[in-house]
Amino acid sequence: MLQSLYLGTSIAISWAWGTSLILGMQIAQTKGLEAFLIWATANCLTLVLFGFLYHRKFLNPLVLDQPVVRVFTNLIQIFCLIIQLKILNETLLNFFDPISSYLIASGMGLFLTLLMFQKGLKASIFTDLWQGLLTIVGLSMMAYLCIGIPSNPSPTSSVSDISWGIWSAVILLSGIMTDIQHWQRAKVDDTQKAFYCASVFFAIYLSLVYVLSLYK
């Protein structure tokens, strides 16, 4: 069970990218609760579906060896890294001047890249675990500090907002197939339960995101 939780945390953090915190709040605040629930449910079910299809042999890892697929997945990984470094830089701007925050973010990005290049998947999973714990603790503390502050209820979703939620759900359910991180983690998921644990972790994470979205 501990192995599933350990790997599941890594899967959830890998799936979060770094943009889901801000994006989730924006969806709840602008598109309403119904659209947020569709988007959030799709995010969680995507992890369950991918794990189920992989372990039932419906997904063939050999497809990743195709040159076109390999180029595409590498581009996605670079894109994810850029997004995460951008989020880190914006966070550091709250504490340092622009040049210092840029240098710190670049240095941390280079260090983690070299660490994962040397240690491989094990290092990536280990760093994900600490990111996950810090994220949940941080969001929980922020939610606690909001107790007693008047909240702003989410607007009611319009038909177009719900349509957007359904469209995004379709994209999410298929988009995970192009992310090589999850293929790598599925390969070492000996218990075949890590993706289910990841969906629960991600649901808790998005619940905290929604709570914080009520406080602008």
Per-region residue spans from a language model:
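Membrane-interface helix-loop-helix modules in multi-pass membrane proteins
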Residues: 1-62, 185-216
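Hydrophobic alpha-helical segments and their helix-loop junctions in multi-pass secondary transporters
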Residues: 78-103, 111-123, 127-159, 167, ...
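Hydrophobic faces of transmembrane alpha-helices in multi-pass small-molecule transporters and flippases
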Residues: 161-170, 199, 203
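Helix-loop-helix module between adjacent transmembrane segments
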Residues: 34-116, 171
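Small-residue-rich segments of transmembrane alpha-helices in multi-pass membrane proteins
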Residues: 6-11, 67-79, 131-146, 199-208
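Short helical (or helix-break) motifs at transmembrane helix termini and adjacent helical loops
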Residues: 176-183
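Short alpha-helical transmembrane interface motifs in multi-pass membrane proteins
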Residues: 5-9, 34, 72-73, 163-167
